[in-house]
């Protein structure tokens, strides 16, 4: 007969990570990182927001293996793939360059930095388009890091998940920058600044909803070819074409992101759309000179200038690395967003993804009274305070009720949480929230 404790250990944890859309500043993340070799290069800056589509998975412990089964956006199944949870085996698998390599790279990092065992990940649903500039690979890396965190109760912060995911991805042949791990922040817009190895992440407060539509162009592009061409212009520019690329990703990008940030905070969608058009023109002019086969992007250009689309939008640009992957538009209204979705499906036979960036909440602090006694729970309350009653969470782990409440508040974006309690239970609450490393 299986005990309750064994059931809890065998239970799976639901894990989710969205994709991300870079509104402005593509490629400036790795370009800013080049300051390690050339301090004359300007810092990089991106404006990023999570998507409302992503990767869904269940995760549970395994003794000695990493096993992953994945599902793409069409419902196609891949795997399961398995590798021993050993450093040499994980590193070799990470360097192969397959989609499974991302999981192996992150697992290698987790194994060498934390006390973890094996893991089984069942990616049972994916509604995030793959290889379309929405950071599907980075989302998968964050998902794996998050799965280790949930299953082994590592208590990583969002920033910690991002760092683990990036470290794991860098063990693969991928040349993506740090921006992609912004998908760990959920659908909250953030501005990210890159100065060599330093990364700053700040949330953006907007006053009015912004109605966007992402369009999967259902065409082909090579991110590897684009990155090879653009990164060939660094760290020192040797030709006029190289200098134009460094300007577009440097000084030009800082100017565009500064004005875009101001427009977002003011809720000025019209100005934001105009800046998108300007940003697209700047990047295309510089990028297509060094990678014309990818960055001239005829499908993208046709969609951005489509006569049925332009009356509905304030502006638009490419997404991610660029090329014929995904387009994004700032719509004039909610009705325009809905009409654009219909038009893209019926007329262009492409896949639209509506994305609404809501105004930031003004409530950032929560006060939770935990000093009361529930008479209906007597005499159990003689032993433990009601907020400390054990409740089985959806991940199958029994936790104090107040811990579940605080986790939900943290997930909702509250910066400060105050518990009002009886002094008798002060030490109990301090022990509940004391970091594991201090125990």
Where are these regions (language model features)?
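Short, aromatic/basic amphipathic alpha-helical patches
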Residues: 339-344, 430-438
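DPxDG-like acidic metal-binding loop motif
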Residues: 134-154
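N-terminal glycine-rich phosphate-binding loop and ensuing alpha1 helix
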Residues: 360-432
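Glycine- and acidic-rich phosphate- and metal-coordinating loops
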Residues: 86, 107-108, 113-132
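Acidic, glycine-rich active-site loops and adjacent beta-strand->loop/helix elements
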Residues: 21, 63, 72-74, 123-130, ...
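Beta-strand segments within the central parallel beta-sheet cores of soluble alpha/beta enzyme folds
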Residues: 69, 118-124, 156-168, 274-275
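Short glycine/serine- and small hydrophobic-enriched flexible loop segments
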Residues: 108-112, 146-150, 262, 407
